[in-house]
């Protein structure tokens, strides 16, 4: 058993490499071994241990980069690095352990592998909302290396795609049990599903060329190090870097800066003057991330992470407050119990905003605004494209250096465009800034650590809403029923 535990841990680590930026797709078949070893376990306690070790390795290699974010302020948070590196995998591994525990009780069922896959998606869904939720690196994101293979997102959403991916990934498990009839069924159904996916994706990509609106947009990526972002001595240098990248002889309609690009209120006279000079010279509207408050005092004072728009006459065209906050980063959960401060600058916790949509009247542009972490929640983002024209996602991935974190965050965010049939404008302080069309094609992008800007046009949205945007997880359930039906029909053909 000791040897099997080591194998589970190592295969779990390997399985974490299926995500961006490595996309080591052969590692998906580590899940076939997990499916097999759970069925082979002597009792549910053993199955739970195998699942836990696999899960610990999976989340350790897939989410190690969170510890890099903690190390940015190492003088204050050195003690938190091992908790970030090992603590999160220790907690998240329980979801895979629970999946394996329940799957064990179905080990003699003819449809054991299907049950394993259904439970996998169930626990991914639970992980997306329990304790504020962390739907990061859902297994469906392993296919985001291919714009063709992610097209089912428009029907199933990410949870439906996760079911497809975990089904295919466990299709080789009868190799270990030497049940070759079952192997034929699973491989045949997986090949059929993949074929349908490729045909659907290829047709969708080829029949939906990227069309553009007339709205010109400039995405500014200054790549300011996190240690310099809130440094008072660096403030004017940082602001002028933004302005210098924004001012250009080429005309534009919108200039977009990243999350918390303005770390002070925009009504400070010297700051206001610089911004108005820039906007008058470019004749553009600025959309930027910043901080905002409710203008109250004492116990009623509230601070928000905001996205707002300013025109050349100093009119604030909209203001959006982030509603999905990062625990421990933007606020401290259980603050009365835990004697720690949050990672982000300042002693005051951010407060949740109300979410919603915003509008720029001049361009008749209806926007779904997303600040950083909000883009990972598919149901929060889900929007009928009849009432929205574009998703604007501002973020700051400078926390995570050259790790896999910024790449994973980009591909997760990009998936929201496909799900909703909406273009996405994504602007990072450092990370990956891009113009993405409504089927997930990357029109233009800036890579990690680039100091530059993108000039382009906002792509047009699709003319009809996607199935996922209209029906949400109900469409995902229908896709699962479809795959179960394929599995059942092929079992009738191949069963001896």
Curated annotation (Swiss-Prot):
One term of GO molecular function: N-acyltransferase activity
Membrane topology (UniProt): Multi-pass membrane protein
Keyword Membrane part of the UniProt annotation: yes
Active-site feature positions: 259 (proton acceptor), 322, 372 (nucleophile)
CDD domains per record: ALP_N-acyl_transferase
GO cellular component: plasma membrane
Pathway(s) it belongs to: Protein modification; lipoprotein biosynthesis (N-acyl transfer)
Catalytic activity, EC: 2.3.1.269
Domain (CN hydrolase): residue spans on this chain: 220-464
InterPro entries named among the record's database cross-references: Apolipo_AcylTrfase (IPR004563), C-N_Hydrolase (IPR003010), C-N_Hydrolase_sf (IPR036526), LNT_N (IPR045378)
Gene3D superfamilies, A to Z: Carbon-nitrogen hydrolase
TM region positions: 6-26, 50-70, 77-97, 114-134, 148-168, 183-203, 474-494
Pfam families reported in the protein's UniProt record: CN_hydrolase (PF00795), LNT_N (PF20154)
GO biological process entries: lipoprotein biosynthetic process
HAMAP family membership: Lnt (MF_01148)
Family: Belongs to the CN hydrolase family. Apolipoprotein N-acyltransferase subfamily.
Functional note: Catalyzes the phospholipid dependent N-acylation of the N-terminal cysteine of apolipoprotein, the last step in lipoprotein maturation.
Protein name: Apolipoprotein N-acyltransferase
Source organism: Rickettsia prowazekii (strain Madrid E)
Lineage: Bacteria, Pseudomonadati, Pseudomonadota, Alphaproteobacteria, Rickettsiales
């Amino acid at each position: 058993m000791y040897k099997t535990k080591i194998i589970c841990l190592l295969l779990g680590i390997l399985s974490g490499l299926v995500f961006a930026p490595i996309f080591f797709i052969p590692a998906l078949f580590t899940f076939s071994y997990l499916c097999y070893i759970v069925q082979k376990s002597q009792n549910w306690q053993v199955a739970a241990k195998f699942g836990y070790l696999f899960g610990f390795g999976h989340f350790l290699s897939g989410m190690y980069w969170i510890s890099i974010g903690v190390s940015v302020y190492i003088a204050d948070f050195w003690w938190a690095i091992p908790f970030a590196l090992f603590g999160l995998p220790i907690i998240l591994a329980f979801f895979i352990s629970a999946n394996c525990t329940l799957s064990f009780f179905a080990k003699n069922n003819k449809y054991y592998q299907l049950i394993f896959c259904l439970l996998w998606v169930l626990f991914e869904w639970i992980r997306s909302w329990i304790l504020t939720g962390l739907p990061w690196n859902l297994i469906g994101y392993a296919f985001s290396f291919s714009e063709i293979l992610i097209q089912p997102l428009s029907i199933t959403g990410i949870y439906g795609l996760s079911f497809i991916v975990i089904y295919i990934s466990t299709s080789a498990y009868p190799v270990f049990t030497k049940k070759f009839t079952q192997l034929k069924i699973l491989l045949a159904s997986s090949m059929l599903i993949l074929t349908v996916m490729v045909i659907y994706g290829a047709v969708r990509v080829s029949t939906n060329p990227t069309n553009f609106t007339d709205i010109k947009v400039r995405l500014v990526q200054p790549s300011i190090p996190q240690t310099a972002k809130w440094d008072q001595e660096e403030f004017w240098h940082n602001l002028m870097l933004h302005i210098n990248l924004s001012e250009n002889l080429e005309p534009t309609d919108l200039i977009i800066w990243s999350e918390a690009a303005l770390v002070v209120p925009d009504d400070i006279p010297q700051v206001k003057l610089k911004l108005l000079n820039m906007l008058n010279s470019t004749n553009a509207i600025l959309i930027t991330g910043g901080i905002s408050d409710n203008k109250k005092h004492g116990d009623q004072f509230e601070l928000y992470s905001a996205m707002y728009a300013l025109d050349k006459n100093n009119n604030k065209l909209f203001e959006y407050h982030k509603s999905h906050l990062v625990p421990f980063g933007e606020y401290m959960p259980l603050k009365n119990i835990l004697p720690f401060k949050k990672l982000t600058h300042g002693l005051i916790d951010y407060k949740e905003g109300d979410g919603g949509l915003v509008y720029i009247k001049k361009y008749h542009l209806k926007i779904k605004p997303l600040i950083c972490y909000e883009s990972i929640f598919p149901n929060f983002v889900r929007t009928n494209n009849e009432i929205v024209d574009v998703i604007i996602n501002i973020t700051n991935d400078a926390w995570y250096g050259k790790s896999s974190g910024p790449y994973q965050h980009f591909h997760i965010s990009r998936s929201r465009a496909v799900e909703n049939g909406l273009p996405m404008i994504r602007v990072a302080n450092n990370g990956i800034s891009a113009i993405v069309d409504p089927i997930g094609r990357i029109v233009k992008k800036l890579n990690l650590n680039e100091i530059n800007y993108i000039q382009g046009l906002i792509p047009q949205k699709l003319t009809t809403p996607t199935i996922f945007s209209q029906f949400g997880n109900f469409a995902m359930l229908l896709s699962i029923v479809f795959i179960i039906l394929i599995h059942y029909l092929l079992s009738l053909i191949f069963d001896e």
